[in-house]
Amino acid sequence: MHYFPLHVDIEESQAPGGLRLNVHALGKAVYGHVIQVRDIFAEYLKGVSGHQEALSGLYGFPYLVLIWFQMLHGNQLLADWITDHIGDEWITDLPAISKLKVFADDEKAQTEFMNIKYQNKLRLAKYIKEHNGIDVDPRSIFDVQVKRLHEYKRQLLNILHVMHLYNEIKEHPEMDFYPRTFIFGAKAAAGYRRAKLTIKLINSVADVINSDPTINGKLKVVFIEDYRVSNAELIFAAADVSEQISTASKEASGTGNMKFMLNGAPTLGTMDGANVEIVEEVGEENAFIFGLSSDEVINFENNGGYDPNYYFNTDQDIRRVLMQLVNGTFSNGDMELFREIYDSLLTNKYGTPDQYFILADFKSYHEAQKKVEEAYRDEARWAKMAMLNVASSGKFSSDRTIMEYVNEIWHLDHVTVDMSIDLQA
């Protein structure tokens, strides 16, 4: 049995009556459980070839689609640079952006591309200084996670790892640590206590780290308040790393990862949601993948066997950051402020402990982050990765998606419209 936190009432007649079913839309209705929705209907419709074929085909399509207008408006420097190199066909036919691939190894193009990224980072750094009062180094890695705050999206994994990095720098000030700026942007539903507590944790960690002169600015944490379209445009253009770290099997699909891709930010993420398709397009060597697979997560959920206390008891790094939740390190000595988060990870006080497998993926996430740093230190390698992400983003076009629906799902006839007719006459 698959468990959904929301009951969806679908009359039996609806599925047999329709030859196509949008599992991504349905997955959104049940908080992103696309894998489970697909599997349920695959069983329900077993032997009905029309249904089965539609489910398998539609699963490959993005539920939401990327429109290039936001990049044209928010990243004019990159848009102009692309047009200078391949012409303007990509503006009306996004798959044409693949022509950029021939420049991925070109040293001059790489330098130009990285300079554009730097200019965009300067712009975001200025915004952060004006709105947050925090000085950030535009030469640091801008590691970005901006999205709705939800436990399955695992902003908590991100900030726990930031706490771990801070511990490492404090213990080993001589270590060769490439400077990082972790940028969060999120909004939480009004009644979502755990999400709001996570935002509090992010800001509390930021207060401690950003005010510690002993780490010499190697690490900064920024929470962008009132995350919205206007500041999102600045963030997407400036991001070096796109954090897409939801628990595998939980994310239906979104457009944030696609927007980061189009702006030249390689994905650090799980094989979940549209990340799967991004990796298919750009190649796993141009992304940083970690964590449990969807099958592994679903197996734990269905059959049990996951014990987060194993990681707490055997991994001293995990144990230390979790203890810092309840020893006042990041809460001005208040040992109760973040106890709910601590308990939710290790006890059944609030339901299944570590429901979203944060501790299981912590070490794998840390290893992926080390690979990010290694790649970023090689500017030519990083520039190539970033450029190939831009050049491989053509699939995530609304025009392409609609045409595939027209041809493969709806089977509509093409109609030629005579644009010379005066429709107002």
Feature locations, PLM:
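Catalytic cores of carbohydrate-active enzymes across secretory and cytosolic contexts
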Residues: 1-425
